[in-house]
Regions:
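Acidic, metal/ion-coordinating pockets
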Residues: 1-187
Length: 188
């Protein structure tokens, strides 16, 4: 999905990046009036073993507050919760594993449920409380988070600047395990 800093360099740079990406970008709450940004809302991916995984992507709407207006001209960044609801409904009964990909963080402590923020900048906990995601991949707060569960959803987040990534494994009994791994650089 897209993060707030993906908009910092203007739409031409963002469009070039997305067109060169060897993947499909899912960010359903970003709308482009000109139709240049190649982003979708959700997709279904069937693994080699036949398991159907549904992916729904969204980003924090606070991009509207932080980004330069010229970088958002012709774009709208809507409510990520509304996008997640629409995506979850579209995937219902079509997939075995619904996954949310959200560039936003947790508004509550996952262990205690204690509120950390009253704003809607970060709504990961609300997504877990209200929607049937089995896995929620989060970002934005840059807090390393693995093997966390909130309201039945496995929640992960990577630290900043790609210093580590999260490997998530789903076992045959439907249980998730996640671990933080460090990328290895190799000379080319």
């Amino acid at each position: 999905t897209l993060g707030n800093h993906d908009f910092n360099y203007g739409q031409e740079t963002l469009t070039d990046y997305l067109n060169a990406l060897h993947a499909r970008c899912l960010c359903g709450n970003v709308r482009d009036e000109n139709g240049r940004l190649p982003v979708g809302s959700y997709t279904v991916h069937t693994l080699k073993n036949g398991l159907r995984v549904g992916l729904v992507g969204m980003t924090t709407s606070w991009i509207n507050l932080w980004e330069k207006p010229e970088n958002l001209a012709g774009l709208s960044v809507g409510d990520p919760f509304h996008t997640a609801v629409k995506g979850a409904l579209a995937l219902k009964d079509r997939v075995a594993v619904p996954v949310g990909i959200y560039h936003g963080g947790c508004e509550k402590e996952l262990e205690t449920g204690k509120t950390l923020s009253e704003t809607d900048e970060n709504i990961a906990c609300r997504l877990c409380e209200k929607l049937p995601f089995d896995l929620l991949l989060t970002g934005h707060q840059h807090v390393a988070m693995v093997n966390q569960n909130y309201h039945g959803t496995h929640v992960v987040q990577t630290p900043a600047n790609a210093v580590a990534y999260v490997k998530v494994t789903l076992d045959e009994d439907g249980r998730f395990e996640s671990e933080l791994l460090t990328p290895k650089a190799e000379a080319v």
